[in-house]
């Protein structure tokens, strides 16, 4: 197991939810068993004189049980091989690094691709995603080069219906340096350094400016749809395109997270608008700082006051204005002069 997990304190171990064993155990089934043996030897009450050792040991046992349940059901998020049989008889093997369930199906994150399995009941949303991604437009090649790398490419690396007919599979290309925000957030125990949150939000706000130009809305920004590159401080939005719509178009679906944080009038009009994406940028920022509601951020000094205030204020409907205020006022008041904050993190750090 990784050194960090092996040396976690009793309080840190007990703080890990029982239903999130992947925050403690990394790798495949063999690595999980090895990690458990290491932790069990350290925390067994017959070997450890710490008064709370029994509670820690029992907590570790319960997390092992949850890990074994997830492995047996195919829901274990760490390394494995996903075998998919297509309706044409061909078989595809995807060696994934992380795997996650989401509201429409499952997602497997590999080194150079990410595969989405969408339940058959949501076929119409798959077609909407394909139309949105195929329809990206750019003012010129310079814009295409600057913005295109933060969006899914088309044609997809793969797209097919499974042989059982129960799911559609979309395989998107992914740069090896891109890490799912959810995995990064879990790796750091549910809270990121505000300096890194800042550049994630800068990248998302920049994308909102492009969406405004292109007349589209994404409607599903979250740590489960966005990927970050620690090496070049950028974000790519590869997931969630099932909910994309043209500005002003009537939305046919939205995930629960969007309904929770979108402008109130969205529930009444159901019309897509850029303000929804701008509100979700703020929600992403709050979640990365440890509290998506924003209620505890100031009390816990999760970031500078200027940043916290901006994250808790309602968004306006002009992304260019929002981006300008963020860059010239909020970032300056929060961090002073611009400096590159290194984040030495790779996929192997998360998976091994």
Regions found by a protein language model. Give the residues of each.
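N-terminal J-domain/J-like co-chaperone modules of DnaJ/Hsp40 proteins
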Residues: 1-47, 59-73, 77, 81
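Conserved N-terminal boundary motif of the eukaryotic protein kinase catalytic domain
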Residues: 78-99
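ATP-binding glycine-rich loop module of kinase domains
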Residues: 95-149
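Conserved structural core of kinase catalytic domains
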Residues: 152-195
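Activation segment signature within eukaryotic-like protein kinase domains
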Residues: 200-201
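Catalytic-loop of the protein kinase fold
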Residues: 208-230
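C-lobe/activation-segment region of protein kinase-like
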Residues: 235-317, 336, 340-351
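Conserved C-terminal segment of Hanks-type protein kinase catalytic domains
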Residues: 317-334, 342
């Amino acid at each position: 197991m990784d050194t960090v997990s092996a040396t976690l304190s009793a309080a840190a171990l007990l703080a890990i939810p029982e239903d999130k064993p992947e925050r403690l155990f990394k790798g495949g089934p063999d690595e999980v068993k090895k990690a458990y043996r290491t932790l069990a030897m350290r925390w067994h009450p017959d070997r450890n004189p710490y008064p709370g050792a029994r509670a820690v040991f029992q907590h570790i046992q319960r997390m092992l049980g949850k890990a074994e349940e997830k492995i047996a059901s195919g829901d274990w998020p760490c390394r494995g091989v996903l075998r998919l049989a297509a309706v044409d008889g061909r078989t595809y093997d995807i060696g994934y690094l992380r795997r996650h369930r989401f509201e429409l199906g499952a997602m497997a994150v590999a080194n150079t691709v990410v595969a989405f399995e969408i339940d058959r009941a949501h076929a119409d949303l798959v077609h909407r995603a394909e139309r949105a991604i195929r329809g990206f437009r750019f003012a010129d090649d310079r814009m295409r080069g600057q913005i295109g790398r933060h969006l899914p490419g088309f044609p997809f690396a793969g797209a097919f219906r499974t042989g059982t007919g129960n799911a559609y599979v979309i395989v998107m290309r992914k740069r090896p340096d891109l890490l799912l925000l959810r995995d990064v957030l879990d790796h750091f125990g549910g809270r990121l350094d505000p300096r890194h949150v800042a550049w994630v939000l800068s990248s998302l706000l920049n994308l909102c400016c492009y969406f405004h130009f292109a007349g589209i809305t994404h409607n599903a920004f979250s740590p489960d749809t966005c990927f970050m590159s620690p090496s070049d401080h950028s974000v790519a939005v590869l997931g969630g395109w099932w909910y994309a719509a043209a500005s002003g178009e009537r939305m046919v679906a939205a995930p629960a997270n969007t309904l929770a944080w979108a402008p109130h009038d969205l529930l009444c009009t159901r019309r897509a608008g850029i303000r929804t994406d701008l509100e979700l940028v703020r929600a992403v920022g709050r979640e990365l700082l440890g509290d998506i509601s924003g209620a505890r951020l100031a009390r816990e000094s999760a970031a500078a006051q200027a940043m916290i205030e901006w994250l808790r204020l309602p968004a306006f409907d002009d992304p260019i204005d929002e981006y300008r205020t963020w860059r010239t006022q909020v970032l300056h008041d929060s961090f002073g002069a611009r400096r590159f904050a290194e984040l030495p993190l790779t996929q192997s750090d998360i998976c091994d």
